Regions:
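Internal glycine-rich alpha/beta core junctions
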Residues: 1-116
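Glycine-rich cofactor/substrate-binding loops
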Residues: 84-263
Length: 263
């Protein structure tokens, strides 16, 4: 067409207008910008929406009555259920899960818009008029809502500890396994010993540490003090600062501006 071939307008006009608008001319185009750019944009929105949902789903699981390690802020007078006054439903994160589906729904039609007849038909137009604003607005709203949920999130450390303690120390089985290996037992035998005792705790209850203390093989290779050290949670927190630094990337010190050299 006349636009793509520049039959009526010199390419310099396009370059001038684009520069004034803070844009760059499309390097490979016909009458329209190739829709692979649009597809990449909406695919990115879909990934962001999925990340929002990932966090929302985790909060929903943590708010379950039998877990209750964290939950959405619940205002005074707020209703969780019209029929059951005691309920504190995670309505905000449930809403975020739904919004993520809306945003992801734009990805497939965006991909399908890439293949236009002879590089230009208008089949993409009606599709983009619907999902383009819907996906962008929905994700903007979802991000704002998620920020509010995280900022006001209620966290219950005591419940976290209670949940860890509820399995009688089984969460420390890996540390016991490694300690037995270091004490000279083969990995296969150490695994069998630890698993055998762990399964008994699963079936019969009780404390994992006490079960191991009663195991003669364990007693021959580890003292009670060495065994007790395996049930110390402190080693799991040694590198917590490093983990947080990786996640939040502390701001690097601003570089001092270079001095201009004199003539």
């Amino acid at each position: 067409g006349p636009v793509g071939t520049f039959a009526s307008v010199d390419p310099s006009v396009e370059a001038h207008v684009a520069k004034r608008l803070g844009l760059r001319p499309e390097r490979v185009s016909t009458q329209v910008i190739p829709r692979d750019r649009h597809a990449a944009y909406f695919a990115a929105l879909g990934v962001i929406a999925s990340s929002v949902e990932r966090l929302a789903v985790e909060i929903r699981h943590l708010q379950r009555t039998e877990v209750r390690e964290a939950e959405e802020f619940f205002a005074k007078g707020q209703k969780g259920s019209s029929a059951m006054p005691h309920k504190r439903n995670p309505i905000l994160t449930e809403n975020l899960t739904g919004l993520a589906r809306i945003v992801r729904a734009a990805v497939t039609p965006a991909m399908e818009n890439v293949a236009l007849w002879h590089e230009r038909d208008i089949s993409h137009s009606s599709v983009e008029r619907v999902f383009a604003p819907d996906a962008a607005i929905a994700l903007d709203f979802a991000l704002a809502r998620l920020a509010g949920v995280v900022e006001n999130l209620l966290v219950y450390p005591k419940a976290m500890k209670a949940n860890l303690d509820s399995v009688g120390g089984l969460v420390y089985s890996q540390r016991v396994l490694l300690a037995l290996i270091q004490a000279g037992i083969s990995r296969e035998d150490a695994y069998r010993i630890v698993q055998s005792n762990a399964m008994q705790v699963w079936r019969e209850g009780g404390e994992f540490e006490e079960r191991l203390e009663a195991d003669e093989t364990v007693g021959k290779h580890m003292s009670r003090a060495e065994l007790a050290a395996c049930f110390d949670p402190a080693p799991y927190l040694v590198h917590i600062d490093t983990v947080f630094d990786r996640v939040f990337e502390p701001k690097k010190k601003a570089k001092k501006p270079r001095r201009k050299q004199g003539a």
